[in-house]
A protein has these predicted regions:
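Surface-exposed, charge/polar-rich loops and edge strands
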Residues: 1-60, 68, 73-115, 119-263
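Phosphate-centric recognition/catalysis
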Residues: 65
Length: 263
């Protein structure tokens, strides 16, 4: 009845089905892990953004690597901007995906330590080899607020470090490198400034990090597992159809043989 399953065509089809089922199950498990990872990241970012602001020195210190639970925490700092030694970070985009610079300004705290402040985005008006015109920050002693970020690395950001850049231009924000350049005690990580709010021609401040689309991974997980469940069902439907077609063909042959030959 089902001897046709031993034919070359059906053996190949069955082997393909047997390979597809575990592959699709594994893809579903991978999407499940992606969903859990993105959900955990979204929860971590949300709790950090909604936590009460704290002084930056409560979380950061010289040489300290900002942890995942500290990242995006709102911090405050009181001191003065050192615009004479500020730099720009190349190839950064704004909310409209326009390429420009981020303005990186050392902020000297009241105790003499320095924290790096990313004041926001400015357009790249002019040659990339020249230092752009940067709107000045508030003069004198000021209190700022922003999100604490970890030092940037090529591994984490995908941005390659480039040697021999024009003066006062960098590719990555790194507190250890800035400490050597400034000859100062620099806190680990940096601040993405959110207050005072940008006014007039001030740099465009960086918006809050968006949440990752975790539900999409959940939908893909369900989709792959439905595909995995559908493979044996589809295989069985094809088997039943093949059996029915063969039985109908055999019945027609018997009918033709039983009919009397014309006189």
């Amino acid at each position: 009845m089902y001897r046709f399953l031993l034919s070359r065509q059906w053996v190949i089809l069955t082997l393909i089905a047997l390979l597809l089922i575990p592959t699709m199950i594994r893809l579903g498990i991978w999407q499940k892990h992606r969903y859990e990872m993105r959900t955990a990241r979204n929860d971590l970012v949300s709790s950090a953004l909604h936590a009460e602001p704290v002084p930056v020195e409560r979380l950061a210190s010289p040489g300290h690597a900002v942890t995942s639970t500290e990242k995006y925490r709102t911090v405050t700092a009181t001191g003065t901007f050192d615009t004479a030694r500020e730099e720009v970070v190349r190839r950064r985009t704004n909310s409209d995906d326009e390429v420009g610079f981020h303005v990186l300004t050392p902020f000297v705290l009241t105790d003499g330590k320095v924290v790096l402040v990313n004041r926001g985005w400015i357009p790249a008006n002019g040659a990339q080899t020249t230092f752009p015109k940067i709107p000045a920050p508030p003069a004198g002693k000021v209190t700022i607020k922003g999100r604490l970020k970890a030092d940037e690395t090529t591994a984490a950001s995908g941005i390659k470090e480039i040697k021999g850049l024009p003066d006062r231009q960098v590719m990555l924000i790194n507190s250890e490198e800035q400490a050597r350049r400034l000859g100062a005690t620099v806190l680990g990580g940096y601040i993405e400034q959110t207050a005072p709010e940008a006014k007039g021609d001030s740099p465009e401040q960086i918006s809050d990090p968006g949440s990752e689309d975790a539900p999409l991974n959940y939908a893909y997980m369900i989709q792959w597992w439905l595909f995995a469940a559908g493979v044996p069902v589809g295989w069985w439907v094809l088997v039943r159809r093949e059996r029915r077609d063969r039985e109908e063909a055999a019945a027609r042959e018997q009918t033709e043989e039983a009919e009397p030959a014309p006189v």
